[in-house]
Amino acid sequence: MKCKILVADLDGTLTLSRNTYELSVEALLALRKARDSGLRVVLATANGLDFALTIARYLGVRDVIAENGCLIHLDGVTYELCSGDMSIVDKVIISTGAVIPSPQNRCRKYDMAYIPLVKDTLEKVRAVVGTGYIVESSGYAIHVRPAGVDKGVAVSWLCRKLDVSCHQVATVGDSDVDVGMLSIAWGIAVGNATEAAKKAARVVVEEPSGLGFKEAVNLILSGDACTP
């Protein structure tokens, strides 16, 4: 079965490493190679939609999954997979003193991002928000969003919308927030991915981050991905 769609994470996957925001030239060239081969490329990121669309424009990508699956921009139309008001829980989280809000939160709707200030931040935030919310780390920030949605849910929605089997979708990621999309499709984890991401993926490539993405694209274009 041939891959039809490539869903790529951004931070830690298209970057030089998992602790920088600098994009990898090798990853960008691989992304262009994938796009030019006929694959439909989708950017899947924890970032807010406005930021994601801006980055996507410069990457030559049209379709975006933003806020860890809460929002999807497909063929020029934005779809919301979440509902609710995050302002109250946002105030509760900030009141712990364990985090500071990301500047992007002003432009976010459902997935709120926070910079941790203390140890065990995940546990502290989970304790105050209770059930009904997902709290996890991307390696760049702590993310809090309504339960029931992640990148995997978004990829599944995308497949139904485009009438494509999830077996014909290759996903590439590096962190815990990518687990959903790595497990629901033909997942490829870069070499320096978290253990959870590696466990969820079908394949773990040797190279890290951007170089790993290049390796993943070569695997996909060779025909060795999206196989039974």
From Swiss-Prot:
Q: Where does Mg(2+) bind?
A: D9, D11, D174, D178
**Gene Ontology cellular component?**
cytosol
Cofactor entry:
Mg(2+)
Q: Which reaction does it catalyse?
A: 2-phosphoglycolate + H2O = glycolate + phosphate
Mind telling me which Pfam families this protein's record contains? Answer: Hydrolase_3
SUPFAM superfamilies for the chain: HAD-like
InterPro entries, sorted: HAD-like_sf (IPR036412), HAD_sf (IPR023214), PGPase (IPR006382)
Regarding protein family, the annotation reads: Belongs to the archaeal SPP-like hydrolase family.
Return the protein name: Phosphoglycolate phosphatase
